[in-house]
Amino acid sequence: MFACNVYDLNDEFEANILAETADNVKRIRHHACLGLWCGNNEMEWGWRDWGRLEGHRPKYKADYTKIFEMLLPRLVKQVDDQTYYWLSSPSSGGSFDDPNDFNRGDNHYWEVWHSNKPFTEYRDFYFRFCSEFGFQSFPGKKTLDSFSLPEDQNIFSEVMESHQKNGLANTKIFSYISGYYKYPKDMESIAYISQILQLKAIQYGVEHWRRNWGRCMGSIYWQLNDCWPVASWASIDYYGRWKALHYGAKRFYARFMATACEKEELSTEIDYYIHNESFEERKAVLRVRLIDRDFHTLFETEREITAAAFEVKNVLPMDFAPFLAEAGMKKRAVAEYRLIEDGCVVSRGTTLFVKPKYFDFKTPEYRISVAEKADVFCIHADADTYVSYAELSLNGYDVVLEDNFFDITSEEGVDITVDKKEFPNQVTAEEVAAALHIRSVADSF
């Protein structure tokens, strides 16, 4: 309701605010996912640190204090005394006291994206709670086709720029692409690679802050969804189609998971962490492999892990340098981890030793099959070489898969399920197989 603005309070407007706030609090106060009520977005910070607010009348600043530090907390206590009220975001507790202080309250961080900083910049910050950060991407082909003709699908066309409301952001996306990937071959590939970058950016920040559990108690990325079909920070587009980020978020926000942390970007030294943000002790096996692009194992080890409730720890420091000494091997090698609990892989990930644009990808030959079970279709995908960020899509259907944008790191391939309820009509395994399409990074240039 209140964001990045200045309000002139009078008796009529005050009554309007109180009525609308009460209505909305009552409307959703029963939701189990409700964590807190926040008074506004970036308004306290704006008064404190944004020069453009300095010229406003002192009355407006007094009105801010009355609305968000007096009226709304009193109202929330009356209609929902079970849920905490936080004055603003970011905030250090109110009264314009350094609202974006990195050591108190919550923080918004936009140097990655708005200031073109690399993803690695996230690791220089140890916020208490990062409540806003983000990275843009284009929507997929189906959504692009909904608002543009083929001849308009150039990111600098009038149509594409009108569907981008963040200034020179299309140029910014291309700048980030150039840092990590080769030039994509067409608009569909540009959109795909932009979504991979969005996933990688947010994952880089989230996993760093999760490794510092205790100091940093959480993060919220900007943003969930869109109000129209557009290039944006959303992880779900206007039509409800999941971008790569939303599948990634399902993985990197898992309660029980592993992460890989290089000593520095592209280092051969990697620390493997276990994260248990559940209420129970967890026992698992962490398996780490170094493979080449043809799935040959160069090194393998595993470790039995016991993680107490809400424990995060470095369980396996590794240096792969001895196995990467052969000329060109860094361009062909992949470090993979799998966290296995009760015989099931619950978390997995990969690390490259060069930027993806320098990795020596081979063109994959994919094999896809579909089997039907009671309530799901089981999709099996494999390939003859390492595959990075494989995306499965179905022509003619919009479905949410169990997982997507995954790596293939062995001849065994990957098994993905899709609930039959995702399809509008009854379909057969043969029809699903005929509609399936797969692509990966190697196909994008």
Can you describe what each PLM-predicted range is?
Residues 1-84, 89, 96:
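Active-site mouth of glycoside hydrolases
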Residues 37, 74-77, 87-96, 104, ...:
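Substrate-binding clefts and catalytic carboxylate motifs of secreted carbohydrate-active enzymes
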Residues 231-232, 301-303, 349:
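Short hydrophobic alpha-helix segments
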Residues 242, 251-260, 345-375:
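Long, low-complexity ectodomains and other extracytoplasmic segments of secretory-pathway proteins
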Residues 268-306, 312-317, 333-340, 379-382, ...:
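Beta-strand-rich binding/interaction modules
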Residues 284, 317-364, 421-445:
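Terminal connector regions
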Residues 285-329, 397-426:
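Intrinsically disordered, low-complexity Pro/Gly/Ser/Thr-rich segments with frequent PxxP/GP/PP motifs
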Residues 361-410, 414-419:
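C-terminal accessory/binding modules appended to enzymatic or scaffolding proteins
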